[in-house]
Amino acid sequence: EGINAEALGANRIELCSNLAVGGLSPSFNEVKEALKFLNIPVFVMVRPREWNFIYTKKEKELMIQEIRNLKNIKVEGIVIGSLNKKGEIDTEFMKEVVKIAKPMNITFHKAIDEVKDYNKAIEQLIEIGIDRVLTSGKKDKAEDAIGFLKTINRLYGNDITFVAAGNITKDNLDSLNNKLDFKEYHGKSIVGYLK
């Protein structure tokens, strides 16, 4: 699918497994294969399991090792997110992620849409040094959160890049872009249907 997406005009690939549950970490071999065949940047999902984004100490250790492995093979970026039991950014873990991962690009994924205080969370991510935030504006579909997405982009868009996500396809991309005017959009069918 990555090769087809590149051929159809994608300018970056987010590589993950098990998209049905929002995406999980792909195997290391899948990442190496993708890097062989793709000429566009590859961002790799670092998420060991589904359910929620509250990770155990052991899971965090595995995620850090995964990030080290990805950095060693020159992956362009990672997509990751971690929350604490209070519904806030797990700032200590995310600081460690930034320390280990840089200079790779770091996208905080849709775990952001589950935080209690969105503005506080964005401010924390900026302070920590996260490059991008993948968000549907706390809704299932980006098109249901136009006002919210425009507001956060106006407030914080100079300090962090917002990537609109949530049922964005080739069919609704132009309409959404006319309303949002974001720099980046994310969707499995954003350049067309790949299968």
Model regions: which residues?
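Active-site-adjacent beta->alpha loops and helix N-cap segments on the catalytic face
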Residues: 2-3, 19-43, 58-61, 83-102, ...
